[in-house]
């Protein structure tokens, strides 16, 4: 581009220094004089003929391929200028125009621009080189055009030299918003930034993410594709392929590239949506070949061709699938429609395109409407000579309102806005100047006013933004077949500011919904409960769907990541679409195990009551008296009842009160029970003890009330400190995946262990004392049963420790309940059931005489054993005394002992036995 500019500059200097040249009138397409001249650049022909000269000479070649739609655009400019001239907007000032055909070539556009920049009213028509163009008066004051962005860029760089205003009606390349590189460029259409943003939004909203893109190899095509790629990525849309076609039809490779593009489309079977940034003649050739290959897709049309009648009228175009396009917002077209109906009365002597159209139309009048435009386009202008005196046939322009069907409303409205903007800017500039003079103002002055002008089209108000753009918005159009003909229908409007599509009625909303029925995805859609996992492809849209793991969920389609549930309060299974609240669990009253434990506790309480009744009714019997009396029995039975009742605090929803009560109630009541058993064990051991030393010690130790109060008091202190320093509290255990365990946190494991350990110490002492007195009379064998009871307690609680440590969940309290029940039942049964059995089933043995006889027999047996042990000791002493003087004579002593009379031993033992028996009998009788 820089080399081109140097070449142009040198070319302009040569023009200035060379001999004056002839005015190239044949290069001007349309002209009309005026006080203020406006230039126009339109691609009336689709291409320029290539030169066969070798070497090629610097000549402007003739153009072919008459474009009816662009011809209508030139008429729109003429009509808009005449509307201003016929209005009071510019009082006494007439706008003139010079319109040139660019032939879709930058070279022709630059040649026309050189003429625009040439000095006004100079016979030599040269561009004078100056360092300061502030007072330079060029041939025109402003330019409308060009249509294609690449041409506008080249022209704008030339116009920057004089800061001549250039207002484009169609160039949408985003780079043209850069006022540093293009300071004199303005446009009455939005930037491609908004169009590509709208396209990406439409694609995402329709549920597509795998699309193709086709563009031209020029500044417009490359910039549009890059901008769309950025917008697509932001909307999670991937471009499967990008095909680039030569920018000009004169390129010999264009047919090959079109075929390659179609082969790519066929190969990418999953791509059902294709975005097309092409010129009209590219799309025309592409679609004709696509119809031959029976390719049916959704085509996203850019504003370049979305309403082009030349393409809409392609035979069998409906076989291509759906075409959804973006076009500029339209305005009031009634005045222009009337202008077209009277076009035959318009003089054609200064309007070569009009005359050419009339001749081409006449030559193709035998062609039906569907092929008429193609016929006109295929005729070569090179075969025609213009006879401006020939009368234009009126009926040709009225044939089914032919020209009106080729009108592109969005572009026509943009041209009207461009002329209106210039008209209002000139009005503001000419308020204090005589604008009938050619040097009334310079182009750069008009540019300054134009940037800030506010104007109206009769309905809406407009002004250029800081980038020189007129953000009028877009219309979304859909090609639909109506009565056998393809028509363009408005589907929605796109609001640039809020990035939303605005539908006007239910029918258009239905059309939007129908688009979603077509799939264009690289991978199958991940349903809720799944997430996308990359497969190694460079495209993020290509993935595989994997299920969300446990405690994760996805509630939308095609989610990149599964969302995490709050593990403390919620959970989710594999492939979940939502989080579920964790169920709060605890050992409830209606639980089957809880019901069983409650029944056992109630049964235990019933047993306690039954024992209490039995003992109360048999209060004066020896069995009850030997048990310590009714007070001790009632205290123990009450403790057992409290132990059974304490299990109820382990069931049901945990509360602070129940958590604090259950352990302390059990601990204190069980300690009181064991303390009573301890006193009973001491009493039994004391009653049947024959060792004087042990008896003396036990008499000092045996203090029932202090023992019970002291032992129980220590446990009360332990529990009180526990409740004060680290009381049990309710805790939500959230470590399980699907439930919240509502449980009592004991507060202090040390305090809990101390409480249980203290009971164990007391139980062990009871066990020792009971074990010492286990060999009592058969009917008085309470110590043996107490030993069994303590063994049951130890076995239960030793088992409890590992089970409690390894059990988890709502049944953890049940473990302690079971242990409490086992130990409580064990002690209750071993302590009271044998006595109840004697009371109820062996009433004959529950008398004082039987008990006295039993005690007497046991005492006699015990004394006999004691006497025998004394005889043995005496014999041993005598033998020792005999042998001591002669240590070596031990055998003789033993032989002497053997010959002692048996009667002597028996007599000695009998005397001692009778004395001990009487004494022991008196002691046992007093206890009964």
From Swiss-Prot:
It is found in: Cell membrane. High expression in soft palate. Weak expression in kidney, liver, lung and brain. No expression detected in heart, testis, skeletal muscle amd spleen. It is a multi-pass membrane protein. InterPro entries: ANF_lig-bd_rcpt, GPCR_3, GPCR_3_9-Cys_dom, GPCR_3_9-Cys_sf, GPCR_3_C, GPCR_3_Ca_sens_rcpt-rel, GPCR_3_CS, Peripla_BP_I. Its main location: membrane. Keywords: Cell membrane, Disulfide bond, G-protein coupled receptor, Glycoprotein, Membrane, Receptor, Signal, Transducer, Transmembrane, Transmembrane helix. One of its GO terms (cellular component) is cell surface. Coiled coil: none annotated. One of its GO terms (molecular function) is G protein-coupled peptide receptor activity. N-glycosylated. Receptor activated by multiple ligands, including osteocalcin (BGLAP), basic amino acids, and various cations. Activated by amino acids with a preference for basic amino acids such as L-Lys, L-Arg and L-ornithine but also by small and polar amino acids. The L-alpha amino acids respond is augmented by divalent cations Ca(2+) and Mg(2+). Seems to act through a G(q)/G(11) and G(i)-coupled pathway. Homodimer; disulfide-linked. This is G-protein coupled receptor family C group 6 member A. It comes from Rattus norvegicus. The lineage of its organism: Eukaryota, Metazoa, Chordata, Craniata, Vertebrata.
């Amino acid at each position: 581009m820089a080399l081109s500019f140097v070449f142009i500059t040198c070319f302009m200097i040569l023009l200035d220094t060379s001999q004056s040249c002839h005015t190239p009138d044949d290069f001007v397409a349309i002209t009309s004089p005026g006080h203020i001249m406006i230039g126009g650049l339109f691609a009336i022909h689709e291409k320029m003929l290539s030169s066969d000269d070798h070497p090629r000479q610097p000549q402007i070649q003739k153009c072919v391929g008459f474009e009816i739609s662009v011809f209508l655009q030139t008429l729109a400019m003429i009509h808009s200028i005449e509307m201003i001239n016929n209005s009071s907007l510019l009082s006494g000032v007439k706008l003139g125009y010079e319109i040139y055909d660019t032939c879709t070539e930058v070279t022709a556009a630059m040649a026309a621009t050189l003429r625009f920049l040439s000095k006004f009213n100079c016979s030599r028509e040269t561009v004078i080189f100056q360092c300061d163009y502030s007072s330079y008066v060029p041939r025109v004051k402003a330019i409308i055009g060009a249509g294609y962005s690449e041409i506008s860029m080249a022209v704008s760089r030339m116009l920057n030299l004089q800061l001549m205003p250039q207002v484009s009606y169609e160039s949408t390349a985003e780079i043209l918003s850069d006022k540093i590189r293009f300071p004199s460029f303005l446009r009455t259409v939005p930037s491609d930034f908004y169009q590509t943003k709208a396209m990406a939004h439409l694609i995402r909203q329709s549920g597509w993410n795998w699309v193709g893109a086709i563009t031209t190899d020029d500044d417009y095509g490359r910039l549009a594709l890059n901008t769309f790629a950025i917008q697509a990525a932001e909307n999670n849309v991937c471009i499967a392929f990008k095909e680039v076609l030569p920018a000009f039809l004169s390129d010999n490779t264009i047919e090959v590239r079109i075929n390659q593009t179609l082969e790519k489309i066929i190969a990418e079977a999953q791509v059902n949506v294709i975005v097309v940034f092409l010129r009209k003649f590219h799309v025309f050739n592409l679609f004709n070949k696509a119809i031959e290959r029976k390719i049916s897709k959704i085509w996203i049309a850019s504003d370049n061709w979305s309403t082009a009648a030349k393409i809409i009228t392609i035979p069998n175009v409906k076989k291509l699938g759906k075409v959804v396009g973006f076009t500029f917002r339209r305005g009031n077209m009634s005045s222009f429609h009337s202008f077209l109906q009277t076009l035959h009365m318009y003089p054609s002597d200064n309007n070569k395109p009009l005359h050419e159209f009339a001749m081409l139309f006449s030559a193709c009048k035998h062609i039906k409407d569907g092929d008429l435009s193609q016929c006109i386009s295929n005729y070569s202008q090179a075969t025609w000579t213009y006879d401006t005196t020939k009368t234009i046939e009126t009926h040709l322009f009225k044939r089914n309102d032919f020209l009106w069907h080729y009108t592109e409303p969005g572009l026509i409205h943009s041209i009207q806005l461009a002329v209106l903007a210039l008209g209002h800017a000139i009005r503001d500039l000419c308020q204090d100047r005589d604008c009938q003079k050619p040097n009334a103002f310079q182009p750069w002055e008009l540019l300054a006013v134009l940037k800030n002008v506010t104007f109206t089209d009769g309905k809406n108000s407009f002004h250029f933004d800081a980038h020189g753009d007129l953000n009028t918005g877009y219309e979304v159009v859909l090609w639909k077949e109506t009565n056998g003909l393809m028509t363009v229908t408005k589907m929605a409007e796109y609001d640039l500011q809020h990035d939303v599509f605005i539908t006007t009625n239910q029918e258009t909303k239905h059309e939007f919904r129908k688009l979603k029925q077509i799939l264009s995805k690289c991978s199958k859609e991940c349903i809720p409960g799944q997430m996308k996992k990359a497969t190694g492809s460079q495209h993020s849209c290509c993935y595989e769907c994997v299920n969300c793991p446990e405690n994760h969920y996805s509630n939308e389609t095609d989610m990149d990541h599964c969302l995490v549930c709050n593990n403390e309060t919620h959970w989710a299974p594999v492939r979940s679409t939502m989080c579920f609240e964790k169920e709060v669990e605890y050992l409830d009253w209606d639980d089957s195990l809880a019901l069983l434990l409650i029944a056992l506790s109630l049964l235990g309480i019933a047993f306690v009551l039954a024992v209490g009744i039995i003992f109360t009714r048999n209060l004066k019997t020896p069995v009850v008296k030997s048990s310590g009396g009714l007070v001790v029995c009632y205290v123990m039975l009450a403790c057992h009842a409290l132990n059974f009742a304490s299990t109820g605090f382990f069931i049901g929803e945990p509360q602070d009160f129940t958590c604090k009560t259950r352990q302390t109630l059990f601990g204190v009541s069980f300690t009181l029970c064991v303390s009573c058993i301890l006193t009973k064990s001491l009493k039994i051991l004391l009653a049947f003890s024959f060792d004087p030393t042990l008896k003396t010690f036990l008499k000092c130790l045996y203090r029932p009330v202090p023992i019970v109060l002291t032992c129980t008091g220590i446990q009360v202190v332990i529990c009180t400190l526990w409740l004060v320093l680290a009381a049990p509290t309710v805790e939500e255990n959230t470590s399980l995946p699907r439930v919240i365990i509502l449980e009592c946190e004991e507060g202090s494991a040390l305090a809990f262990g101390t409480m249980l350990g203290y009971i164990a110490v007391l139980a062990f002492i009871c066990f020792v004392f009971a074990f010492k007195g286990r060999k009592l009379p058969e009917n008085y064998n309470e110590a043996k049963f107490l030993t069994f009871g303590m063994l049951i307690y130890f076995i239960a609680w030793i088992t409890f420790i590992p089970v409690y440590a390894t059990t988890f969940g709502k049944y953890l309290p049940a473990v302690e309940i079971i242990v409490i029940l086992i130990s409580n039942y064990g002690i209750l049964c071993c302590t009271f059931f044998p006595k109840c059995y004697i009371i109820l089933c062996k009433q004959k043995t529950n008398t004082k005489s039987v008990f006295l006889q039993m005690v007497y027999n046991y005492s006699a047996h015990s004394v006999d054993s004691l006497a025998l042990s004394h005889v043995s000791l005496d014999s041993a002493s005598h033998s020792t005394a005999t042998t001591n003087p002669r240590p070596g004579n031990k055998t003789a002593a033993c032989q002497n002992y053997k010959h002692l009379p048996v009667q002597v031993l028996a007599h000695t033992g009998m005397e001692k036995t009778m004395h001990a028996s009487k004494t022991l009998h008196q002691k046992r009788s007093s206890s009964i």
